[in-house]
Amino acid sequence: MLSAQDISGLMAMMPAFATDNAGDYRARSTVDVGRLHAGVDRMIGDGANVISTTGSFGECHTLLMDEFRTLAHETAAVNKQRVPLFVGVTSTHTREVFEKCKLLEGAKVDGILVGVP
């Protein structure tokens, strides 16, 4: 469990690293895992003390559920608990918030962020 002392320094608000075709409404699996891994490594290497994802760039309404799961689990996998990781589960309704929380089971995340869209 994290304490207040574990959260200090720079919190990197990470975007969803998207595939080149992510803007196409027919696109699926639009999380670019290679870019995501490189981005997380760079953020940590550049001094980020905490990482937060799916919470500040509109992912709550732009990612499909399988894309959300991929982004969260891949971020946790590359992070390897080097820094605290928070994942946003914001949605337009409560049921989806709980579904997103269930999708995080098994991922090494330190906390969730819930906002009102």
Predicted regions and their residues:
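Active-site beta->alpha loop and helix N-cap motifs at the rims of alpha/beta catalytic domains
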Residues: 2-117
